[in-house]
Amino acid sequence: MTFAAHQCVRVNLAGLMIQGVTFHAAVTDALATVVRKTTEEPPAYLVDLLFSFKGLKEIEVPEERIRPA
């Protein structure tokens, strides 16, 4: 599935470690807005989280962990 810039999405962050922050199993449905696609293979997107998690607001997320909101 391809996502567009400014599209509202839900991201599953459970078990990911991003910039030293580990997201626990409960973080399966975080609201975010797509900023841009960052890589084609494997596909990943930079997203702007609705809520900051331990100071993280913009993070890169693999496409398989993103779904439309």
Annotate each PLM feature.
Residues 2-69:
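Basic/aromatic-rich interaction segments and small domains that mediate binding to polyanionic partners
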